[in-house]
Amino acid sequence: DDVWLPEKVEKSIKTLKEKNVDFVFGDLEVVDQNLNTIYSSFGDFMLLNRKIKRCINSYKLNYLYNCVTGCTILGKSSFIKDILPIPSKSKYVVHDYWMGLIMSLKGKIAYIPEKYIKYRQHGNNQIGTNKISHGFKKLDQVRELFINVKLGVFGTYVENNDKFPKELQEQNKKALEY
């Protein structure tokens, strides 16, 4: 139920070709059910845009911050074999998080700062900005959640170790043995 602006696909394809990358994603506008703006820029609201501009192709960026929003993604079909299957057992790794990480490990990524999607925020979103931003009341809750999520994400990566380059497989093995 998100709204794609008419130029979304065309601009994504153009960026993919012009920047000679394997995968593009972009910012979006967060709106309510009546398309009224809640946040004009998801990237600004979540404090991601500055990080993205600094280190777009680092897997560490996608691992720590989950910068990729699924509905903004466009990638080359040759990468489907790398991202599939998407881990389904993990409660911590959702599809866009997984795709962003794998693409940053295996290919080149470009970011489109323009907003070609109106992301409709409601109770049925898989994650949603309200659940992310307004659910934390105390710093301890945030710290505890961060630790638990990263441990869960790491566990998912270990289970899918064959998707990663050899040097990262070795790092995963060392971390697991630690």
Question: Where do the PLM segments sit?
Answer:
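Nucleotide-sugar donor-binding/catalytic module of glycosyltransferases
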Residues: 1-135
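Terminal low-complexity segments of carbohydrate-biosynthetic enzymes
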Residues: 136-178
